[in-house]
Amino acid sequence: MRNRIEQALQQMPASFAPYLRELVLAKDFDATFSAEQYQQLLTLSGLEDADLRVALLPIAAAYSYAPISEFYVGAIVRGISGRLYLGANMEFTGAQLGQTVHAEQCAISHAWMKGEKGVADITINFSPCGHCRQFMNELTTASSLKIQLPKRAAKTLQEYLPESFGPADLGIDSGLMSPVNHGKTSDDDEELIQQALRAMNISHSPYTQNFSGVALKMRSGAIYLGAYAENAAFNPSLPPLQVALAQAMMMGESFEDIEAAALVESATGKISHLADTQATLEVINPDIPLSYLSL
């Protein structure tokens, strides 16, 4: 990953490459740009907003983990706060393809896990597939979300997904990224369980009521959280493990460094993530211990 990031930086225009390099290679870089940092990049580059976001896509794509397709896709989400979040696609050799995370899903979940309550626009290398269009239609900002592709004018999500099916069709009026706290608690004092419980309490699961969260502990001691992102069309739903793995990937972590995992989910939900979580972790490393709590 580091080599790909270096290569991407070398492609950047000289007008803003030094400043961008300083940001991206900083030890505390978290694959986001503040509104102020992005404004400085705009000033230095002299580019229009859309053109700069497209120019930055190679940085996002450099985070991709795609051992199956070797097809590296980047995405950049702008939250309603003005901060920009990078994302990339993620694949798992040995796991069924349904465990794949698309770049759009990665960038959106990245923003969500860092506290964003909505997405203003998303910039991607290639036209979003139907799966991702449906995933984005779950968002709080689905009606106004704009999609920017290289060498094209921006379009709204609804132009890419006309006559769309979404939460409202199932009687749900709160979208993905809505502020929520399910208020679940546990007396279990295991740190990773408590962290997974934090993720569970912000999860989006209006259709199955399987509120769920995952926490991953790395060898470095860092902990990454993932909340379940359910979708009205069911199949585009993003499991909590994948959300947590995306957070780790966007911080430059290696999946080989996962030391332990925890899954907390509702005991009364209509589905369970336990079997799929176990299976995916088994593919990554069969020795990763998984703590489990059903509430």
Curated annotation (Swiss-Prot):
The keyword Metal-binding applies. Binds 1 zinc ion. It catalyses: cytidine + H2O + H(+) = uridine + NH4(+); 2'-deoxycytidine + H2O + H(+) = 2'-deoxyuridine + NH4(+). The active site is at residue 104. Its EC number is 3.5.4.5. Keywords: Hydrolase, Metal-binding, Zinc. This is Cytidine deaminase. The gene is cdd.
